[in-house]
Amino acid sequence: SILIFYLCSDSNQMERKIIQTSDGSSSVYLPEWDENYHSKHGAIQEAYHVFIKNGLDLFQDGSAIQVLEMGFGTGLNCMITYLEAIRRDLKIDYTGLEGYPLETKMIFELNHLEQLKAQQELEVYQNIQTSDWEKLAKISSKFNLTKKGIMFEDFHENGVADLIYFDAFGARVQPELWTESIFKN
């Protein structure tokens, strides 16, 4: 494991470690909360099972879709959605919300592109990770990304999603994100 300290945007220092999950993909572990960013069984496996198989796959090939991710985290779900969009000729407008963005340096230490066998998409991955927050980024002709540095409970835009990736930490560590008011919003 690589031990890295980063300063969160709330000015509280939080330790983060890069770990390997069972499918070989890396993830981030927060010792203070005893919580992983992804399933210990596999970061990539989880993303495909939860967000693609049970979300994006419900839309027909060639569709135009607005995706809202609550918990942008490492950007893995965004990258996998991009890869699926290319494969299925989808037009995606992707909005990612993140209250505590990870440092780009740490994200580039993750092995997601290798594990996805998508090294040819390095430029796209870099663009996803380094695009400015609060601005629309044209990742490709059919994939737009807006990253917003905002807490879930402070996001109040209506009509911005056909599909929501709710990728919050579990209720054990963030019970405030698992309330009825969050889901009504």
Ranges and model annotations:
Residues 109-157:
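S-adenosyl-L-methionine
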Residues 2-5:
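Extreme N-terminal basic, low-complexity initiation segments
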